[in-house]
Each structure stands twice: as structure tokens, then as C-alpha cells.
Design a protein with these regions (language model features):
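Short, solvent-exposed segments of well-ordered alpha helices
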Residues: 2-5, 36, 202-209
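An aromatic- and glycine-enriched ligand-binding surface/loop that stacks and positions planar moieties
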Residues: 4-174
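Structured segments of extracytoplasmic/periplasmic soluble domains
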Residues: 17-21, 48-59, 220-227, 234-241, ...
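Amphipathic alpha-helical segments in well-structured domains
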Residues: 38, 42-45, 231, 235, ...
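Active-site proximal loops enriched in glycine and acidic residues that flank catalytic Cys/His/Asp
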Residues: 63-65, 86, 158, 221, ...
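Long, intrinsically disordered, low-complexity segments
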Residues: 70-119, 201-211, 225, 230, ...
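C-terminal substrate/ligand-recognition segments
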Residues: 140-240
Length: 315
């Protein structure tokens, strides 16, 4: 049932938890001294991920990447193990419906049209049936450039917007920032199309948060198992769907895991994983804003409140 967790979702979440424990211990991330052995945690992560990958027949990788983010295909699709249940026709407070597309859409003052195909061109569709975007969630230009041009996931970052008749309205360019054109000067960075709803009810949409996808579990297994035959199999399945070739054979455990981590970054971008990935890999200090005060330990855990420590002196 959409919006509710089943046994497979529980197994998938356990796989994620054990992977985070393992990698946090292995990387020396603050706060994980209590974890006894990283290898034991990796083994448990692989075990629970394998239960999801091999022990059920409901979920699998959707061979069509576009379907994964098609708002009207998700509820009966095969990729999403656990996600929210938003409804564009719901009334009341936000939470029964979502405004996620607005967070990503550029603010042109008109309805934004994008290609209905990840390949670009052809028929166009509304990003959402509403005129205003918030431009809050922005794609970093340098991040987009880390994707191979053959990677279909690169097309999930919009670089061209259209008029309703299908003609090109504007193309992204960093130099657009200084343009006198009121559309172009909003389109100086690409924007993510993982959250669209062409049939939205004004700003009320059915766009969901993707809490656990089958692809994540495949990559969890690969990272936990390391460069085994099955580890290679699952990371390469995700890469194949994205239009890419297999990882090189013969990688060391460290190099293989790093390759899988880079795959996770590209596969799960804009789905709420970023800060947690930085924390578990002990890399939060690599991504802070350099002209702002930064306390490394606070990027991982806030200090325990003094009142709670006073009430629990043995903890």
C-alpha cells in the first residue's frame, strides 16, 4: 500500500542502517566508536540487502528510468519500495499533497514546459500546472558536469525549457544570470525533473518523496559485499539502466567501494541522501561553505543537551 511500509521496506531500511554503521566505523566518522567491527556490519548490510534483491518478486529495477519519476506511474511501479502518498486532489494542509515541484522549478512567471522524454525534444509537458517556482533547490553546474554525457541520469537535470507549442523558449547557460531577458536570467543553472506533476491542482501536486528505491538497495549490497561477483552484478545493473558500461574488473575493496559510492551520488541525487552520505563517509568538512563558521563535530551530531545528561548521569 502506497505510504505504508511492508516487510521488504523493513529489510531495506535495515540494510541501510547496517551500511551506515559499517561505513561510519570504517571512515572514522565522529560518534561511532561504540561500533565493534565494521566488517560485521557490512556483512549484515549485505544479508538484508540480499533478502530484498533475491527474496521477493514484487520489487525490481524498472528498466525505464523515466518511469521511476513519472508521477502517475509510481504507485503501480516496481522500483519504489517505500515512498510517501501525496494526492493533488487532497484538501487541508500540505502533507496530504506536496509542493515539491515548486522547490525545483525556475520562476518565469509562466507555466514551465519541458520535454516529455529524457532524450529531449519531441513532445513537451508541463513541469507542473502552476506558474510559479521557488528556485530553492538548485543543481550545481559542476555537479552536473561529473556525469558522463552517455549517462541517462544527466538528462534528469533540465537544460532546455519550451513554449507550449514545443518551440525552444530558453537554454540554460551560466551567463544567463546577467541577461536582460526575464526568463533567461532565471535559467542560469539546470534544474531537477525528478519531481514533476503536469496535472497538478494549481500548486498542489502528487509528487512523492522517494524514501527507499530498489536501486538504492542494489548499491547498498554492492558496497557492503565489495568486489565479489554479486557485488559487481548489482552495481552494473544500475549502471546498465543508466546507459553505462560495467565497472572495471579487478578493483580492490577500497576502490570498488569508492566507485559504488560515486554511483550512489549520481543515482540518488536530489532524493534526500546527501548529508547522510557525507556524515557516514566522514566527508562533511569537504562540503561546507568556506566563508561561514564551521564546527566539524556539529556536522555529525549536535551536543547532547545538558539537561538530558543531568537527568541521565549513567548514560
Amino acid at each position: 500500500v502506497q505510504g505504508r511500509a511492508d516487510k521488504v521496506a523493513a529489510q531495506a531500511l535495515l540494510a541501510r542502517v547496517y551500511l551506515y554503521l559499517a561505513s561510519s566505523k570504517a571512515s572514522g566518522a565522529p560518534g561511532y566508536d561504540w561500533v565493534a567491527d565494521a566488517d560485521d556490519m557490512y556483512a549484515l548490510a549485505a544479508q538484508y540487502a540480499s533478502d530484498v534483491l533475491e527474496g521477493q518478486t514484487v520489487y525490481r529495477l524498472d528498466p525505464d528510468l523515466g518511469n521511476v519519476y513519472d508521477v502517475d506511474h509510481q504507485a503501480d511501479g516496481v522500483e519504489h519500495i517505500f515512498m510517501t502518498s501525496m494526492n493533488r486532489e487532497a484538501s487541508g494542509m500540505e502533507g496530504t499533497y506536496s509542493q515539491l515541484p515548486q522547490m525545483f522549478a525556475i520562476q518565469t512567471g509562466n507555466i514551465v514546459y519541458i520535454s516529455s522524454s529524457l532524450a529531449g525534444g519531441g513532445e513537451v509537458m508541463k513541469f507542473m500546472n502552476y506558474e510559479s517556482g521557488f528556485q530553492v533547490m538548485r543543481v550545481d553546474n559542476e555537479f552536473r558536469d561529473t556525469y558522463d554525457d552517455a549517462d541517462l541520469r544527466k538528462q534528469l537535470m533540465v537544460t532546455t525549457i519550451y513554449n507550449e507549442d514545443g518551440s525552444v523558449l530558453a537554454t540554460y547557460d551560466p551567463s544567463n544570470l546577467t541577461s536582460s531577458d526575464n526568463v533567461k536570467n532565471k535559467f542560469f543553472y539546470p534544474f531537477c525533473r525528478k519531481y514533476t506533476d503536469p496535472k497538478s491542482n494549481s500548486n498542489r501536486t502528487s509528487a512523492n518523496l522517494y524514501l527507499i528505491r530498489f536501486a538504492e538497495v542494489a548499491l547498498t549490497y554492492a558496497e557492503a559485499a565489495g568486489p565479489t561477483e554479486e557485488g559487481y552484478k548489482w552495481v552494473n545493473e544500475v549502471r546498465k539502466r543508466a546507459g553505462l558500461g560495467a565497472l572495471p574488473e579487478g578493483l580492490s575493496v577500497a576502490d570498488f567501494r569508492e566507485a559504488v559510492i560515486q554511483e550512489r551520488i549520481k543515482e540518488l541525487a536530489f532524493e534526500g541522501h546527501g548529508i547522510y552520505e557525507l556524515r557516514r563517509l566522514n566527508r562533511a568538512d569537504e562540503r561546507h561553505i568556506t566563508n561561514k563558521a564551521f564546527k566539524p563535530t556539529y556536522a555529525y551530531f549536535y551536543p547532547a543537551p545538558q539537561r538530558e545528561m543531568d537527568l541521565n548521569p549513567q548514560r
